[in-house]
Amino acid sequence: MGKASRDKRDIYYRKAKEEGWRARSAFKLLQIDEEFNIFEGVKRVVDLCAAPGSWSQVLSRKLYLPAKLSPDSKDSDLPLIVAIDLQPMAPIEGVIQVQGDITNARTAETVIRHFDGGKADLVVCDGAPDVTGLHDMDEFVQSQLILALKLFFTEVTFAKPKSSRNSSIEAFVVCENYSPPEGFNEKDLHRLLEKIGSPSGADDLDCSSGWLEGPNKVYIPFLACGDLNGYDSDRSYPLPKSADGSYQSLDPVQPPIAPPYKRALEMKKASSHGTQGLEKLSLDP
């Protein structure tokens, strides 16, 4: 009953299982592509925070498999897809997996080696930074992210896919036309990280919001993605019934292999069994 209830309440969860996606988030990337056409001309792509792999599935189906099935395709012409996550992920055809930290320079060097020294045409990420719970600090950190993106891309847009619930306070930043500042050197980032990592480095940073006022204040356009006549992620839909009037719920395509919450679930299950054991003992004569 529980599975059928969720299938009814979450149409994208149900459609993901029916279409073979590992998670409903696959539709978010598909709807972003419908609006921005981000896959056009892409030969090298990186998927950050990839597990359990629904976005990597989209990349494989949209980029790798069509090229592989083309009669004129050559191995050297096939798109290269690299997926990165701290957690292990089940294999996906055409996707190179790297288990590592996306903030580590060595991980970036590993990706570039897979690209034979080339740079990525597209980087996608369905991950979010941890929040501190201190709203002023979180807002400052997010403003720093927006500033960094505006410095490196000429077009920055907030996109809200239709498969993203209205009740979910999330949006995706779509950045186009990579154009780094004049004189920018990638090694500058390494020096900056080394400075911030030093005991006194943080003391040199201006964490006030005053510099964001006046001419420095930036407004980012917000755009809804997806067919307005498509499925509504906040609405319940009737379940498709078979000839005998029954409904069979499908299992998830590929559950996470080693999710970070696995230990918590095991402890909860063990605690529940312990409580049931105590209740049984108390009822015995």
What role is predicted for each listed range?
Residues M1-R44, W55-R61, L65:
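Class I SAM-dependent methyltransferase Rossmann-like catalytic core
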Residues L29, C49, Q97, V123, ...:
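Residue-level signature of catalytic and energy-coupling elements of molecular machines
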Residues G2-A23, E35, F172-P285:
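SAM/dcSAM-binding transferase cores
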Residues V46-G53, L86:
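Class I SAM-dependent methyltransferase "Motif I" SAM/SAH-binding loop
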Residues L59-L80, F153-R165:
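Conserved S-adenosyl-L-methionine
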Residues F115-A148, F152-F153:
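Mobile active-site "lid"/loop adjacent to the S-adenosyl-L-methionine
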Residues K74-L80, I84-D130:
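S-adenosyl-L-methionine
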